Amino acid sequence: MATQKQDGFVLEAKRTRTRPPPLYKVLLLNDDFTPMDFVIVVLQKYFSMDRERATRVMLQVHREGMGVCGVFPRDIASTKVEQVVSFARQHQHPLACVMEEN
């Protein structure tokens, strides 16, 4: 650390630590109306999953009521939630997508 004298005082530079931004999980929530194939398309299109992984996540959503699509910084997570909900509404599906702090 650098020190310098000024008017009889010793000034010492303080090292600041930057923390990584908080991360958020993007979750899909199960419903009784959205087709499983549509959920797979969403996971492939917006979360860059291959078909096998998308199928596993879709089955988790179906069986457990929710599934994690990915973990992202807040702005990216928020954008993905908006994109998924908008895409689902355009195709007249009630698919719910939310984010929560990791």
Curated annotation (Swiss-Prot):
Pfam families the UniProt entry points to: ClpS
Domain of life: Bacteria
Gene3D superfamilies linked: 3.30.1390.10
InterPro entries the UniProt entry points to: ClpS, ClpS_core, Ribosomal_bL12_C/ClpS-like
GO biological process: protein catabolic process; proteolysis
Entry-linked PANTHER family: ATP-DEPENDENT CLP PROTEASE ADAPTER PROTEIN CLPS (PTHR33473:SF19), ATP-DEPENDENT CLP PROTEASE ADAPTER PROTEIN CLPS1, CHLOROPLASTIC (PTHR33473)
Recorded family membership: Belongs to the ClpS family.
Subunit structure, interactors included: Binds to the N-terminal domain of the chaperone ClpA.
Function comment: Involved in the modulation of the specificity of the ClpAP-mediated ATP-dependent protein degradation.
Protein name, as recorded: ATP-dependent Clp protease adapter protein ClpS
Lineage: Bacteria, Pseudomonadati, Pseudomonadota, Betaproteobacteria, Rhodocyclales
Gene giving rise to this polypeptide: clpS
